[in-house]
Amino acid sequence: MAPTPWISFTTDYGLADGFVAACHGVLARLTPTTRVIDVTHLVPPGDVRRGAAVLAQAVPYLPAAVHLAVVDPGVGTARRAIALAAGDGLLVGPDNGLLLDAAAALGGVRAAVELTNRDWLGADVSATFHGRDIFAPVAARLALGAPLADAGPAVEPSTLVRLPVPLVRPEADGFTAEVLTVDHFGNVQLAASGSLLEPLPRSLRVERQPAVRVHTFGDVAPGELLVHVDSTGQVAVAVNGGRAADLLGVTPGDRLRVTAG
């Protein structure tokens, strides 16, 4: 495979400790000319669905790259370490559903391998820091152009772990949908496609709260609840100048009913 000058890096490691720096150090030692794009390291700890959503929303706008992602509550267990080829990119991380939405956003999984080649890994693999000792070294070697097949044996894509399909239920006067993510601003992204808003009127209800269907935040007065199609094409609920998640009392995995008002 041809070398790539880019690695993207997404984790739940936070910024208070040295975990991100340690992984950057591994990458810099192995492939010092490769540029690293830090997508985020503030995924809520262990929140695989949030990490998957952030990664999937980012990769279509990144250059062709090796996408290194670690949100890994099962680190050190029997869960597989994997790398995937998808579209013009490669993805490296745990086999826990984290990578598959991003792979789909890139065009779908073309090949998958389990990361078992000891020559590609750190000298001493910690049971609790696979980001440093497995995933970062593999990402670096792939960025240098090493063949994906050399990382380990092929994995049948149908056996990869998938996240549960979130609920979306169309109804006569609206729909019920699972909360996918809550972003930094408190905006609530639903699993529902924006197309589900098309038949609904401007005046809506989100559960018992009155809301307005609009194009953007400033279409309503400050403090008003609004429903719109977000930048990824999903239905989102927001408050102009406020936090919809706090107003509605919801977190990812909860369900919201959106109906004609």
Swiss-Prot record:
Keyword annotations of the record: Hydrolase, S-adenosyl-L-methionine
Binding-site list for adenosine: 12, 72, 187, 239
Catalytic activity: (R)-S-adenosyl-L-methionine + H2O = adenosine + L-methionine + H(+)
UniProt xrefs under Pfam families: SAM_HAT_C, SAM_HAT_N
EC code(s) of this entry: 3.13.2.3
Binding site for (R)-S-adenosyl-L-methionine: 187, 231, 239
Source superkingdom: Bacteria
Entry annotated with the keyword S-adenosyl-L-methionine: yes
First-tier enzyme category under EC: hydrolase
A GO MF term: hydrolase activity
Residues carrying the site annotation Important for activity: 72, 79, 130
Function, as annotated: Specifically hydrolyzes (R)-S-adenosyl-L-methionine ((R)-SAM), the inactive form of the ubiquitous cofactor SAM, into adenosine and L-methionine. Is stereoselective as it cannot use the active form of SAM, (S)-S-adenosyl-L-methionine, as substrate. Likely plays a role in preventing accumulation of (R)-S-adenosyl-L-methionine in cells; maintenance of (S)-S-denosyl-L-methionine homochirality is important for cellular health given that the (R)-form is largely inactive as a methyl donor and can function as an inhibitor of methyltransferases.
UniProt record similarity statement: Belongs to the SAM hydrolase / SAM-dependent halogenase family.
Protein name, as recorded: (R)-S-adenosyl-L-methionine hydrolase
Naturally occurring in which organism (per UniProt): Salinispora tropica (strain ATCC BAA-916 / DSM 44818 / JCM 13857 / NBRC 105044 / CNB-440)
Lineage per the UniProt record: Bacteria, Bacillati, Actinomycetota, Actinomycetes, Micromonosporales
